[in-house]
Amino acid sequence: MQSWPRRTSCRRNMDYADWELTINGTNLHWPEVTIDVLFTKAGKPFIVSAHWPGQTGLHTAMRFGGWSFQQNTRFHSLTTDVLYALLRHSDGFQFRSRRIMETTPDFETAVQKMYNTDMMAPQYFIMAGAKPYQGAVLSMDRGGRHLPGTPPLMRLGNASAGKRLGTSWYLVQTNDDMFEQPRDHRRPDQELRLSTATQSMVSTEWMWKEMLGLALYMEDTVFTSVYVPATGYHETLAHPGQFR
């Protein structure tokens, strides 16, 4: 996620393996069943979302003129997640994110609603708005808590992000906590690449080059999405050659 001089953009690689569906003797994997869904309201584009079969909530989406959203896995216990859902009535993120995106037009209100939600599982939410430096990474704990060891709400341009990254116009969130030891090479490699870049380089073409580069593109990358809420730019590229 990065801020342009006049807008903010968000991009993601969805990495997800170990699934296939056989239809008429043909094995289909995640990339072959990834589609771009356009929701309309009063005949006008409202929300765009990267979707999979049977999906009714949102994991990668943008509200036109408003804000974008993506969810990243934060490693956790599935058994505990189920217990929180059953006993505490904590929310699953897909339905909650759809409700908020449908009813909340502005970025700041959406960030606060997401951050204060009682979620059943730890995870990361990456959100970008239509204005410059409207970008945030929400490191979520289950049960509506914000634990001492969990990174605070990180924003583009804030001091805590700049202190760690040496800059304020971008944030990199993969599947591990900021300021902690990375679980894989993606975050440190991409931060190293960005340390040699300048904000004036940012464009949709530049974002695609970064997302498909060696630092972020993995063997199990299912699709890549780029969203710019201010302009309505959106594109999702599935990678059907993966998992073969």
For each feature predicted by the language model, list its residue ranges.
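C-terminus-biased signal that marks the final domain/tail of proteins
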Residues: 1, 95, 101-244
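A contiguous strand-loop segment
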Residues: 1-92, 120-122, 222
